[in-house]
Amino acid sequence: MDDLAQLQSCSNELATAITSLASYAGSGNTQQAINNQSPFEPEEVQRAKGNILAVATKLRTLICGPTDFLQHLASQVSEILACLRWLGEFQILACIPLMGSAPIKDIADLTNVPESRLRRIIRLTATAGFLREPERDHVAHTPLSASFFSNPSLLDAAMFLSESAAPIALQMPQTAQVKEKSSSPPSNGTPCDLALPRGTEFHTACKRRPKLNRQWLAYLHHAAGLHTADDIAAVLTQLDWPKLTNGRDGSIIEYAISRVDHCHAQVGVSSWSTSIARRLAHFYPALHFTVQISDPAVAITQEEFHPRITATSRILGTRQTAAGAAVYILHLPFASSSPSAVMTELAVHLDVLRSRSGILLILTPRLLPQPGSLPDPEVEATARSRDLALGQMADEGEMEMLELLETIDTVRDSLGKLVVTSKLRSRNNLVVAVTVEYQRDLPS
């Protein structure tokens, strides 16, 4: 398809998506339908918004030349990000009324910043829909900027991008030189080491610096496209759980690895994992859950207690001794940080999967989509940006889909092997979970 035909196709897709969103907005609050980002908004609205953004990205790719590309980077990426940091540093957003407007001079005097600098920053961010100048030398919130005031976690994410992620990312060339000249392990040559005290791991720094940890979690949640426990539980409801446990005791084993995801580790791996079990227990009252935690020192608190959830421990890589369950949910570690751990964890489940037909193993690794496989290129860009950020800050990385499939295919014993039976996808078409069963070899 040539560029002109692609433009026409994108035009038709855009018109359809806008009509869909307008149809919903016509039955209610138009502005709310457009600006609301609640996870509870109707699925058709979220789909229409996603389609509009996806088509907009395709259009930009089709018509953007090299000069346009650089100008976009200069204004909408580097300078806008710097402006957000500046606004956050001087707490400007909190001084602007949520309703109406205020003189820019008054805001400058209140925050003790130069009026001319504030005016320039407001006028630049306004081009991105962040703040506006309703009349000359006055500033007012837009729905976008107001959300950064009402939800400070959004500003934390922006501050992490500007203070940590972007500076560390820009140090990649220096890091490559460090690795070439040093005989130390790769983890000693990450950009994070150049920004933090020598030898200090990023996640250790997060534990020692609550502000950094808070901003890191906000970045993962808002900017990095990380799936939450709610997201994963929602995807798992795509399975027919009553059918999976039919004729069995309804027992589900869930294994949480303490360093499966440093976002979860920082907020408490037990809390993250039991939150998935609690959500599934809420939807399926006949099921009983056993949550296995890899670190025996991690305890389940009273707040996390549920009458149908039992907590135990199992060290990573040790044999799975909890037999008799209908389903095993396994949160895999990073492939790059522990390349053999994924293979080992799959292998230690061979015995329980082989013991009875129909037993299901559900894997919830953080997977990178196959290149170019998603309808929305921004979704893939977000996932790959997160993967690069993890590598730059902690020398970790996420698993490619093909890597996981190849790994599963190699796990076997003398009687059979593991096979993938389905892929469970989120609303944006990312694979969130993979279901696996044991398949016996056919008689020769």
Curated annotation (Swiss-Prot):
GO-annotated molecular function: DNA binding
DNA-binding region extent: 104-123
Annotated HTH iclR-type domain residues: 74-144
Protein localization: Nucleus
Highest taxon listed in the record's lineage: Eukaryota
InterPro entries: SAM-dependent_MTases_sf, WH-like_DNA-bd_sf, WH_DNA-bd_sf
Chief place where the protein resides: nucleus
Keywords recorded for this protein, A-Z: DNA-binding, Nucleus, Transcription, Transcription regulation
GO terms under cellular component: nucleus
Function: Transcriptional coactivator; part of the gene cluster that mediates the biosynthesis of the tetrahydroxanthone dimer neosartorin, which exhibits antibacterial activity.
Name of the featured protein: Transcriptional coactivator nsrH
